[in-house]
Amino acid sequence: MEKLTILLLVAAVLMSTQAQNQEQRQQAKINFLSKRKPSAERWRRDCTSWFGRCTVNSECCSNSCDQTYCELYAFPSFGA
């Protein structure tokens, strides 16, 4: 009878430890995924959208600034 009691206690401790580890892994996964941003969201926030104020090309999402506003598209220049 004592062996059965000890065996049940050991099993209960192992199950408790396993459940706790599972909860920690799930929480770590939730934390990791909540910190990530979709690339589209990151892209929108890191640059100025079309017709926003700018001074250099790198400020615009289109990478095209006419020294005042962001252009919709970086038009190729045809040598004049």
UniProtKB/Swiss-Prot annotation:
Q: Which residues carry this modification: 4-hydroxyproline?
A: P76
**Is-annotated flag, keyword ATP-binding?**
no
Claim: Signal is one of the keywords in the record: yes
Proregion span(s): 20-43, 78-80
Q: Which residues carry this modification: 4-carboxyglutamate?
A: E59, E71
* Location (main, coarse): secreted
The protein here is known as Gamma-conotoxin PnVIIA
Upper lineage ranks?
Answer: Eukaryota, Metazoa, Spiralia, Lophotrochozoa, Mollusca
